[in-house]
Amino acid sequence: PDRFCPFPGGRGEPDCASITAAIEACTRTKCVKSLGKPDPIMLQVTMEGLDARVEHSMMVGDRLQTDIQMALDTGMVSGLVLTGEATADDVRALTDEHRPRYVMDRVDRLIPAAVWHELGWTDDNRTDS
């Protein structure tokens, strides 16, 4: 599970793994099963609930060890957005079997160019939070 959730400016907020670690420390009990990322159960249950097929879907995320690994473990196409902790150098260092199929600087790159044009969007429309 993710230890922290990155925010603009380099700060982070506690995420599932750090909260689990705090509970383990307080209770002196080890968590025996995590159903969060990268465990494929999350995507499998979601896909069943949506009556969707893995081969017609794509998991997009900003973390290699959780988002992309979950997609790979589920057999789903993966897309990495370089807005989180992963960098292009991190992707280049991966073996082919661990590399996401798509890598993009922004999630709106998934929108076809024709739609961008129809909406009058340009790269200048980017807003950084």
Regions from the language model: what does each represent?
Residues 1-129:
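Asp-based, Mg2+/Mn2+-dependent phosphohydrolase catalytic module
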